[in-house]
Amino acid sequence: MDYVIAIPSYNRPTEILKKTLKTLNDGGVEKERIFIFVADEEQAEIYKPTMCKIVVGVIGIANQRVFISNYFPIGQYIVSLDDDVEELQTLQDGKLVKLTDLHDFFTTSYEILVRENLFIWGIYPVRNAFFMKSGVMTKSLKFLLGVCYGYINRNLKELYPTAEGKEDIEQTILYYKMDGGVIRFNHIAVKTKFNAVGGLGKDRFEMNEKASKLLKEKYPSVVSIFHRKNGMSEVRLKCIK
């Protein structure tokens, strides 16, 4: 199965060149597979130096993810990456090392989805070797980080997140509810700078508070809310096997 790379981005033309596009090139992914989704024509202009296919989508990360699914045909295998991915890393002998062959990883991940009759995969949400498990794949309800995931496109409204903020948590829930499982590779993590300047998200504190409450109201059986020391609202998913 041929795959495409979808990168939603906003105001980071230099960042994407130095990070995600370099990461993909180093990992053996051809530029012809890569689509960068931007908010408007002005943004499209500043991304021209990337020499990738630029698609004018919509504003807002949740809306952009829906646009991406609508853009590609049903059955297309899509790998979604944020624009500031420095590396994908894998756990080896208790340490995180660079995952060098991304083409092979993306291809193998698709084969696993087909084998398990599931439609979305993700990676471990925290880059911390102490908590990760070498070679372990789970199918239970576990959070799939929006920075890097792959899915077989079905273009179903039932799978579209509505929360602007924590849309990746809602996406995880929606796929699990529909398919009875989601694949997470607990030995793979991403090196990136979360909540960096620019990007599609803003006013994170207020957005997280609002999104957390919305998710708790919509999915009370699987969502609980906690607060970090800085007051930031976060969501936990109840593990359902």
Can you say where each PLM-predicted feature lies in the sequence?
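Cell-envelope/extracellular polymer assembly enzymes that use nucleotide-activated donors
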Residues: D2-A6, E170
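Short, well-formed alpha-helical segments that are part of the catalytic scaffolds
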Residues: I7-G28, E42-I46
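Short, solvent-exposed loop/turn segments at secondary-structure junctions
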Residues: Y10-R12, E42-Q43, G60, D84-E86, ...
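C-terminal catalytic/acceptor-binding lobe
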Residues: R12-K19, A163-G165, I169-K241
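Short, hydrophobic beta-strand segments that form beta-sheet elements in well-ordered domains
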Residues: E32-D40, W121
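A structural signal for short, well-ordered beta-strand segments and their strand-loop junctions
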Residues: I78-L81, F119-Y124, V182-N186, S224-H227
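Conserved catalytic core of nucleotide-sugar-dependent glycosyltransferases
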Residues: L88-I169
